[in-house]
């Protein structure tokens, strides 16, 4: 497709689910967009299997973009991404995995990728409601265009995956990117626990614990977090009448 795309193209874009008749077109598009070769069974699955959310963006009848995602229980997350969610979430908590998101070159920077991503979020809110806590994906470390796209939409790098991809016999590194939704979050780190302790101390009334113990805990915390907002200069004031 080499036609000049008008700036108003997004207003003419329609969305529909992929179907079996789209297989040849989708194969051609994925060959242009991605360096990975997918088996024929993959194309059959994403165009026919209802477990996939496979949405096409069309312009004047032609597919110019698509997103393929799967909403699944957290127990089905592959081992390398098993810590996307904190262990406190129940086993029936769901996540959404983006298998593919692409837009025809001439139609990029027209908002079509964002439209497809927002449509996935709408689908999640309708089907999984608040049971889905994260949307995640994998991307080549060298794919700066995709990385910038996701980072600009609040996805954050979660893992570095060395030798994750095999492309024409050559091993390539990847990243896992995650967008947390509906209160989802990763496991806490040591820094998270320290910051939580700092917040808890900041909310305590000094009169509720012995003055001396409070001062010792406060000093210890500040030694870990010199930037802490509960410093004695700008934080809690002590009463001299305690």
From Swiss-Prot:
Residues 193-236 dip into the membrane without crossing it. Its main location: Golgi. Acetylated: autoacetylation is required for optimal acetyltransferase activity. It is found in: Golgi apparatus membrane. It comes from the Eukaryota. Substrate binds at residues 38, 99, 165. GO terms for molecular function: histone acetyltransferase activity; histone H4 acetyltransferase activity; protein homodimerization activity; protein N-terminal-methionine acetyltransferase activity; protein-N-terminal amino-acid acetyltransferase activity. It is a peripheral membrane protein. Disulfide bonds: none annotated. This is N-alpha-acetyltransferase 60. It comes from Rattus norvegicus (Rat). The lineage of its organism: Eukaryota, Metazoa, Chordata, Craniata, Vertebrata.
